[in-house]
Amino acid sequence: MKKIMVVDNEPDIVDLTRTVLELGGYQVVTAFSGEECLRKLEKERVDLVLLDIMMPGMSGWDVFNRINKKSPDVKVAFMSVLEISEKRKQVLLDEGLADYIMKPFDKDTLLDRVDRILAEKTEKAEA
């Protein structure tokens, strides 16, 4: 079973996202800050991190950069209310970001995007 970490400082968002992912057949780990995410990644192996950008303390940008350098095999997707330009999004994708998911999202969209990210990861691992 694929394991996903959901990182957001809003407990309601974490709970909703966890519920949707668990109903989709995924194992879910949660964190409420960038620092907590990085601590948990030291101990737990995950396939994907769904990461909010705007959090107190360490931002999602900083967390993404640290994960990308230390564990490039772990996929990261941003979940955010922040709209970014297509140019900026492409730069992030070129730097290794797996996806940029706008909040609010519906459950089908979230599961479709997560399924696609993890399918691409599996295909690359098998190649």
Model-derived regions, located:
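Two-component/phosphorelay signaling modules centered on CheY-like receiver
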Residues: 11-29, 95
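Short amphipathic alpha-helix used as the core "switch/output" element in two-component signaling
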Residues: 39, 61-72
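Active-site residues of response regulator receiver
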Residues: 52, 80
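Receiver (REC) domain active-site loop signature in two-component systems and cognate sites
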Residues: 55
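Acidic catalytic/metal-coordinating carboxylates
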Residues: 32-33, 59-62
